[in-house]
């Protein structure tokens, strides 16, 4: 194994790389979601919300859920209980973040809907 190969996997155990990538994406989504909730609920400044990037955010969250699901399936094939619990937790967190983002988007659409 060359030194580049070791750097590429960051010395994680096999199968954990997908779960860690999903965890990193979860933290990014959490930051964007917290900013949007703050702009929507606290300061009511809707121009700073991430409406222009909704498609990218939803697609990124679906990719994150897919990576977490693949990491969870790989963890189920191993005998490590900690890895299984960690992977399932990341999968559940990503799924919850997806539905929270979806609810916030629909809430914002209903709030901004013009009534004549």
Swiss-Prot record:
Its main location: membrane. Residues 39-51, 108-116 are extracellular. Keywords: Cell membrane, Cell projection, Cilium, Flagellum, Membrane, Transmembrane, Transmembrane helix. It is a multi-pass membrane protein. The chain crosses the membrane at residues 17-38, 52-72, 85-107. One of its GO terms (cellular component) is motile cilium. It comes from the Eukaryota. Signal peptide: none annotated. Residues 1-16, 73-84 are cytoplasmic. It is found in: Cell projection, Cilium, Flagellum membrane. Component of the CatSper complex or CatSpermasome composed of the core pore-forming members CATSPER1, CATSPER2, CATSPER3 and CATSPER4 as well as auxiliary members CATSPERB, CATSPERG, CATSPERD, CATSPERE, CATSPERZ, C2CD6/CATSPERT, SLCO6C1, TMEM249, TMEM262 and EFCAB9. HSPA1 may be an additional auxiliary complex member. The core complex members CATSPER1, CATSPER2, CATSPER3 and CATSPER4 form a heterotetrameric channel. PANTHER family: CATION CHANNEL SPERM-ASSOCIATED AUXILIARY SUBUNIT TMEM262, TRANSMEMBRANE PROTEIN 262. Auxiliary component of the CatSper complex, a complex involved in sperm cell hyperactivation. This is Cation channel sperm-associated auxiliary subunit TMEM262. The lineage of its organism: Eukaryota, Metazoa, Chordata, Craniata, Vertebrata. The gene is Tmem262.
């Amino acid at each position: 194994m060359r030194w580049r190969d070791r750097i590429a996997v960051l010395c994680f155990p096999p199968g954990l790389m997908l779960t860690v990538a999903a965890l990193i994406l979860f933290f990014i989504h959490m930051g964007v979601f917290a900013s949007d909730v703050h702009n929507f609920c606290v300061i009511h400044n809707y121009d700073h919300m991430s409406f222009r990037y909704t498609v990218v955010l939803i697609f990124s969250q679906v990719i994150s859920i897919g990576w977490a699901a693949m990491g969870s399936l790989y963890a189920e094939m191993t005998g490590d209980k900690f890895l299984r619990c960690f992977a399932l937790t990341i999968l559940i967190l990503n799924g919850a973040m997806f539905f929270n983002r979806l609810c916030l988007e629909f809430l914002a659409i209903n709030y901004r809907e013009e009534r004549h």
